[in-house]
Amino acid sequence: MFDIAVIIHDSIIINKYIDFSYINVDKYKFLWEFEHDWDQIEDESRMINVFNDLELKTFYENKDLWKGCFGCMTIIRHDYLIYINNKYDISKLLYYVLDKYNRQSFERVIACLLQKEGKKEVLLGNIHKYCNWGIPFNEIDKCKNLPVIKYWTGR
């Protein structure tokens, strides 16, 4: 059991010590957010509709109320994660997240679920303002000033 989880993925480098015990996390905190410039409305709506929740669908459709969570990378309290899962059963999305396109939609859907139930908080701001987009691994030395580095690989 854990009180707080830090969810990151494999193309992330924690470049400086981060004392998470000093980061105030009421319910959750995204590592990075992003705007709605690249929404995939049809795919996202298909996922949102799985929950059969009109209030959630209305919230999702009002793009002024929420932003995406880059890579779904989040600091989240265990009790809040349990609350979200009990309310929405996020495992319903397993059948819908099958490829990169769906994973990008999931970044918006999980962000929507978290923000509908709790005020949005972000640790590092907007990913598109935080660092240069598309930093390859062999250039991460140019980002030593950043506490967390996101790099891109060609898979």
Label the predicted regions.
Residues M1-R155:
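ER/Golgi luminal nucleotide-sugar-dependent glycosyltransferases, focusing on the catalytic module
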